[in-house]
Amino acid sequence: MPMVTAATSLRQALANPEAFIVAPGVYDGFSARIALGAGFNALYMTGAGTAASVHGHADLGICTLNDMRANAEMISNLSPTTPVIADADTGYGGPIMVARTTEQYSRSGVAAFHIEDQVQTKRCGHLGGKILVDQDTYVTRIRAAVQARQRISSDIVVIARTDALQVRGYEESIARLRAARDAGADVGFLEGITSKEMARQVVQDLAGWPLLLNMVEHGATPDITAQEAKEMGFRIIIFPFAAIGPAYKAMQEAMEKLKRDGIPGLSEEMTPQMLFRVCGLDESMKVDAEAGGAAFEGGVELQK
């Protein structure tokens, strides 16, 4: 029996009104492995985290389609049955590029992606000063993604994101999302929700359509827990800074300690073997043994 793809699995979950998807933000293979090890059933590949980890730059439209697709593919293939929702920015161009983005993400194993209505020189949705394309251009992007998905008979989930709230206000944001829904988008995403009351209102105003909540702590949106989002009626919640925020703090403290004391001072359990086990060491050793290899017959523990 063929394996159900991650995209199909996510689509089936969205068709089940009782299902609720919590996706922590990950930005590289290590953060993805840690999230999977914690038991999450979906992941979110953050564009901000990708820009920071791949390029060392802020989320200002630095990443190309190739950057994002390669990172999304690597993360998706760590656990091919686990849905990965990936940032796809503006689709990286006009309708032809949006279609190409859709096709490449789908063939890379990505389960879902979101496309927004900022200009190509975009910025993080929780920064001020955003500039939007007109609604017709936005809808063209969504339509191009939906039609590309249909052409290749893919189940990849198309998420329509609008950044209009901070620029044009709530009513135009809802109008844009309705237009995206009419163009075939599977899920709606209002970026930068500013209150819990607004969160409840958008669910009411777009009733019957699955909605995603973006929970960026200390950004434009007040703290909303996964349980609260579920009770409000959202179907997906993502936490883009769930990994990169704590990683920054931990690495900063370790570097300061190394600079000050001449050694990072890692805890005793932080051995190479432990870190490699997070990254599939035991599974790789099993593959070698089952194929008749002898590379790991003696194990990998140091003899002291």
Where are these regions (language model features)?
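Flexible C-terminal active-site loop/helix
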Residues: 258-304
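Alpha/beta enzyme core
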Residues: 2-239, 245-249, 253-256, 290-304
